[in-house]
Amino acid sequence: MKYLVTGAAGFIGFHVSKRLLEAGHQVVGIDNLNDYYDVSLKQARLELLAQPGFQFHKIDLADREGMTDLFASGHFERVFISPHRLAVRYSLENPHAYADSNLTGFLNILEGCRHNKIQHLLYASSSSVYGLNRKMPFSTDDSVDHPVSLYAATKKANELMAHTYSHLYGLPATGLRFFTVYGPWGRPDMALFKFTKAMLEGKSIDVYNYGKMKRDFTYIDDIAEAIIRLQDVIPHADTQWTVETGTPAASIAPYRVYNIGNSSPVELMDYIQALEDALGIEAKKNMLPLQPGDVLETSADTKALYEVIGFTPETTVKDGVKNFVNWYRDFYKV
């Protein structure tokens, strides 16, 4: 099978590409290698992917002509869109960058899929779409009409755009709502990475809402495993579905949405404790108020995911954080 993986030099795109290659698939990876964070980390990921069956193209998703040419010559069978422009707080400071990548770039991929008969499009959505929802755990049956950040709004828009193309053109599309992904080769702007770096350098860490937050931390290997299983679960039109009686996660079109999370929310302070234990260092903490765009808790209802792939993420925070610390020390020689 031949795959196009966008954001292949990024955290999730790298891990998914690696798993696909290990399974014997061909992978064409693309990334614009922007300097939002350390490009050398992205290059290091690509070096590990440089093996038979992998090709890389530096291209921006918002490059309409470039993306059209890539699809026309690529002869892809399936497409995985990994997360682009992820940080909630950064989206408040750089809204146009998010529109270019998450909206214009997403549209270019949908057009490429439409005109080139892609078998299955899997794309990254986010738990952030649940926004002001308070009912726990978050279910794909819930409304997601009240986002609290521009990033979340673009992810909601992606789901709507994907549904439109599924409905109009019969494009099988699966949306993946990821819940706080962490682990080896993670992004430097993520809490675990920032905390680890600061603690090893003897610096303080910023703890928002005074630590009174919960996240459904989900280990990267579990995320990749779920994606690998879901790529073979190609959605079909549900002729019995109606707006009045059906779940928002399905449709009369070949369209589905799933939560991918650990289904076990962890207090931020417990997450930090796991890191302190793994590093053998007590963190110096700056206790700060809740930041704009943040929510107090996330929790994934993954029953629908389990029903179709027989798998739900299960790596504990203790084990996952320890694995990250081992990778960080090895990669940065600290």
From Swiss-Prot:
InterPro entries given in the database record: Epimerase_deHydtase, NAD(P)-bd_dom_sf
Transmembrane segments: none
S-S bridge residues: none
Coiled-coil features, chain-numbered ranges: none
Keyword Mitochondrion: no
Residues holding substrate: S126
Keyword line: Lyase, NAD
Family membership noted in the UniProt record: Belongs to the NAD(P)-dependent epimerase/dehydratase family. dTDP-glucose dehydratase subfamily.
Name of this protein: Uncharacterized 37.6 kDa protein in cld 5'region
